[in-house]
Amino acid sequence: MDNHRRTKQPKTNSIVTSSSEEVSSLEWEVVNMSQEEEDLVSRMHKLVGDRWELIAGRIPGRTAGEIERFWVMKN
């Protein structure tokens, strides 16, 4: 039984760690995009859904995180 507790403890810690690393929406910075970028994000989202890496690949200089943050804050 002691081995079971030892192996279970790190899993609990990793869950706590990952949830404590979540970013509150209040801490997000506003992402300003040009009208062209907004249109492209909207069209790409209709085609591929929440595949932010794929969408970011079509918009030079934008990261997947920026695009997702823009989408979440806009919608």
Curated annotation (Swiss-Prot):
InterPro entries: Homeodomain-like_sf (IPR009057), Myb_TF_plants (IPR015495), SANT/Myb (IPR001005). Expressed in leaf epidermal cells, stomate guard cells in leaves, cotyledons and hypocotyls, inflorescences, developing seeds and siliques. One of its GO terms (cellular component) is nucleus. CDD domains: SANT. GO terms for biological process: root hair cell differentiation; trichome differentiation; vegetative to reproductive phase transition of meristem. Residues 1-20 are annotated as: Disordered. It comes from the Eukaryota. This is MYB-like transcription factor ETC3.
